[in-house]
Structures are given as C-alpha cells and as structure tokens.
C-alpha cells in the first residue's frame, strides 16, 4: 500500500491552503461548475479544476473511452470501453477523493439542457462539434448561466494564437476561433491542453470574482 492511501481530507485541504491561502481555498472549496463534454477539453479541464481545489463538479457525457481518444484526452488504456463519466470520476478521485463529483451519462440536447444544468451557474462547454457548441451556448445563455466555451484548438500551430475572449458578461470563448480539426491535421494534445487550461483558468477567475480576461 502506498503512503498516499493514508492521506485524509484535512491533509489535502491544508496542502491547498498552504499553496493558495485560506481566502482563495474557501472560495474554490465552496464553488461548483458543470462540464459538458469529457473529451480533450473537458477531461483536462476537470483535472485542472480539481487540482486547483474546486469543491464540486458535474460531468456530462454520453460516450465511452476509445483508443483514438488517448492522443489528447485525459484517460489511460485501462479506461478503454468505460463511460467517460466513470473514467473521469475515477481519475479525479485519485487526485482528491473528497471532491464532490456528480455525473450524468447522457446526450445533451436543446430539449434537456436546461434540466441537466439547472443547479449550476457556471457551465463549461467542451463539445467537439460546432452545432453542439452553439446549441449549448444558446441554451445556457437563455437560462442566464455563465458559459466558458472552447473554439479553435486543432493542429500544431502557434500556441500564442489561443486566447480567451470576453464576448458578453455571461460568455467567454477560449481558442483561436479559426482552426478546424478537418483542416489542420486533427486534434493534438498540446494545443487542446492549452485551450483547456484557458477555460479552466477563466472558470477559476469567475469563481474568484475576476470577470475580466
């Protein structure tokens, strides 16, 4: 048995307090966000938020882990065939077993989106397809939610083209806004991860009251 098996909640919380200070720790600990889509963006965003100390997440995806996901998504060979919601929850609890992780293994549609995300004010859009992204963003803005979306992170172009833009007080878009996976050698881990980090960081900023980019 590893030494980590004996680490309790108090030790994890104290380690986060030492890193961030009590004020930031408690703001994050008392916050929650929903992640729609657990692919290259969502699986990495979830990991970053849990490492930062967020108190709760809702993970939503209908898909299972496939070998083709491993080039950019935060999963391992042992997860192939598992629902992404279950695989992500397992990994996140290996980082912090005390974070509250709710899951919903469902296909998000215009008809069910409001009900799925009704208990969350911060929604992270992490879908693959443009039409699904637009559907969720529009649905959540109609529900007066704050949305952090990803758009344009394909290929291996310059990292510096990926930026965070504030569109309205309720909508932030991270990415280069241009590249499509069909045009630039598909999706690769570095730029996908950079975009995921932009989204995770913006969510942290919103939680901590920093709404500018």
What positions do the PLM features span?
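N-terminal charged helix/coil linker that caps or initiates catalytic domains
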Residues: 1-33
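Glycine-rich phosphate/adenylate-binding loop
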Residues: 2-7, 114-122, 126-213
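Hydrophobic Val/Ile/Leu positions in short beta-strands of Rossmann-like dinucleotide-binding domains
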Residues: 35-38, 59
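Hydrophobic/small residue at the entry helix of a nucleotide-binding pocket
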Residues: 41-42
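Hydrophobic residues within alpha-helices
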Residues: 45-46, 88
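Conserved S-adenosyl-L-methionine
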Residues: 51-56
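Glycine-rich phosphate-binding loop and adjoining beta1-alpha1-beta2 segment
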Residues: 61-95
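A structured beta-alpha segment of the ubiquitous adenosine-cofactor-binding alpha/beta core
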Residues: 85-91, 95-120, 127-130
